[in-house]
């Protein structure tokens, strides 16, 4: 959905996961640590996540806006990033559907073992559900049925975001 939205609104799309996976390839202490953390299915701690994402977003290509996927994942991150958010799109998907979709992707990602996927889903409930509630209270949340087909999801997101422009 991020790529579709990027094309529609002509702003860049990036994901926190992609940023972390790229950094995890680096032959540095941080790269090795990130690789271990990601492969275990654990969340990168708030302080490191904020440092990495906020530094990354200082690049000139993001000055006019961006679509950011997978961040913030905790209330601490949301509070620290509050000024950088116009709307939050939440694709509402059951655990069963999430597991099915992730497990069904053709991927060579080392962080997509069944154990790591289940741990990520558990982490989502523990840490990210409060973020969804945080943005709901601020009136910034757009909740979309993520179990529809791709076109239906895009239509619903677009309908809400078009109200902003």
Q: What role is predicted for each listed range?
A:
Residues 1-165:
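Glycine-rich phosphate-binding loop of ATP-dependent small-molecule kinases
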């Amino acid at each position: 959905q991020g790529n579709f939205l990027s094309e529609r609104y002509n702003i860049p799309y990036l994901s926190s996961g992609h940023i972390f996976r790229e950094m995890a390839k680096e032959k540095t202490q941080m790269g090795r640590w990130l690789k271990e953390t990601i492969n275990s299915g654990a969340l990168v701690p708030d302080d490191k996540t904020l440092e990495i994402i906020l530094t990354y977003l200082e690049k000139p290509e993001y000055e006019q806006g961006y679509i950011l996927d997978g961040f913030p994942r905790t209330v601490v991150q949301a509070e620290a990033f509050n000024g950088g958010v116009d709307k939050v799109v939440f694709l509402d998907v059951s655990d069963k559907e999430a597991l099915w979709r992730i497990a069904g992707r053709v991927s060579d990602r080392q962080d997509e073992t069944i154990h790591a996927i289940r741990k990520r889903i558990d982490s989502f409930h523990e840490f990210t559900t409060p973020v969804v509630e945080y943005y709901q209270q601020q009136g910034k949340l757009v909740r979309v049925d993520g179990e529809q087909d791709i076109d239906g999801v895009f239509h619903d997101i677009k309908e809400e975001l078009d109200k902003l422009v």
